[in-house]
Amino acid sequence: MVTTTAKNVGYITQIIGPVVDAEFPEGDLPAIYNALLIEGKTDSGLDIRLTCEVQQLLGDKKVRAVSMSTTDGMVRGMKAIDTGAPITVPVGKSTLGRIFNVLGEPIDELGPVEIVDKFSIHRSAPKFTDLVTQPEIFETGIKVIDLLAPYRKGGKIGLFGGAGVGKTVLIQELIHNIAKEHSGVSVFGGVGERTREGNDLYNEFKESNVLGQVALVYGQMNEPPGARMRVGLTALTMAEYFRDVSKQDVLLFIDNIFRFVQAGSEVSALLGRMPSAVGYQPTLGTEMGDLQERITSTNEGSITSVQAVYVPADDLTDPAPATTFAHLDATTVLSRQLASLGIYPAVDPLSSTSTMLQPAVVGEEHYNIARGVQSTLQRYKDLQDIIAILGLDELSPEDKLVVNRARKLQRFLSQPFHVAEIFTGSPGKYVSLDKTIAGFKRVLQGEFDDLPEQAFYLVGDLDEALEKAKKLKDEGKS
């Protein structure tokens, strides 16, 4: 949405794809990032009304802008109105449960949105004096994350995983848990991904009853680079309102952060900037920093961001993922191997990392238990080749014990999700961090070496596992 406060009127002089040049009267040039409203009729008589964002002042009374929608049908000489302000989008509770485009216009065919307030998508990062510097764990209620790769409140998390390993379900569960346990809300920014995926996500949110706690902002693959480059800022702006005005904890999902960089690269080339390494824009670090620095904890609330990261050609040294990694506090890696074993969430306990997992932050007990779980699982992984060739019987008694315990730990890291109840028939579980630590401590110490590993599969806390073991024993007797 654009707010027209000034009425400097110019006209279009050149159109090259999504890039538009406009000429304005002397002394009335629009500022960088101002929104221009383009109005006119096509040769066939159709009305055109679209928004562009000023990117360059060319001199000679001309500006260069990038369009937020397709420029099909545009002709030279059309009117360009300077709105006098950057793109502004609606913010507040009325955005929850709705889908918006980059301009903050609803695209879900559910009618207009009640606009209480509007924010500019270009905002400064919070002041240093307003930031919370004490690291604090953001409890998700998901055992494997809270124990082995905990999220930082106001931090940035990279979500890595291929198709069909459970990214969407994990995102839905996080949205459910922040709403139910933290009275928080979520904003989902679909940046340059498939329209079909955006549609599927909306329907899945609807089915799992989390749609009312999330605002969706889409700038999909088929849209011009201007829209894909700015849709992340639109989603972030909506999240900032909930943090700064509503004083809530917010989860911001960006899928996919690589597409944000890719769109910036396209725009940079169209604007005639000299490319840098691998053809990326020379301003890559600055653009990424401008977005990421706004995602943080303040004295009012927090924005915790989960960002799906596509790694081109699996090359982690590519400038796009490499620049992203510099900002991440944690990584959650989803494993196809675990998914094929039926262990959900399929979070890889050995590949997922977090800067929070250190004794000074989580405490000695949590740290030692997490490292104990990881070393047991690593030893099991090392032994798998031997088991495949020689079988379990050829292992030493110590190694047999490690394998037995590791298989229990692996299954105990699985958990039924609230949002998957309709598929699994099992009620979802939110497990507090204290219960998670206490449960894994006892399993690691070998207290339950005599229990069947099946008792630990898809349960919440340890009490539930013991109850399941008793049930299995009773069934075995009968």
Curated annotation (Swiss-Prot):
Cited Pfam families: ATP-synt_ab, ATP-synt_ab_N, ATP-synt_VA_C
Cross-referenced SMART domains: AAA (SM00382)
SUPFAM superfamilies (UniProt xref): C-terminal domain of alpha and beta subunits of F1 ATP synthase (SSF47917), N-terminal domain of alpha and beta subunits of F1 ATP synthase (SSF50615), P-loop containing nucleoside triphosphate hydrolases (SSF52540)
Top-level taxonomic group: Bacteria
Keyword Transmembrane listed: no
NCBIfam families in UniProt: atpD (TIGR01039)
Subunit and interaction comment: F-type ATPases have 2 components, CF(1) - the catalytic core - and CF(0) - the membrane proton channel. CF(1) has five subunits: alpha(3), beta(3), gamma(1), delta(1), epsilon(1). CF(0) has four main subunits: a(1), b(1), b'(1) and c(9-12).
Function: Produces ATP from ADP in the presence of a proton gradient across the membrane. The catalytic sites are hosted primarily by the beta subunits.
Protein name: ATP synthase subunit beta
Organism: Gloeobacter violaceus (strain ATCC 29082 / PCC 7421)
Gene name of the encoded protein: atpD
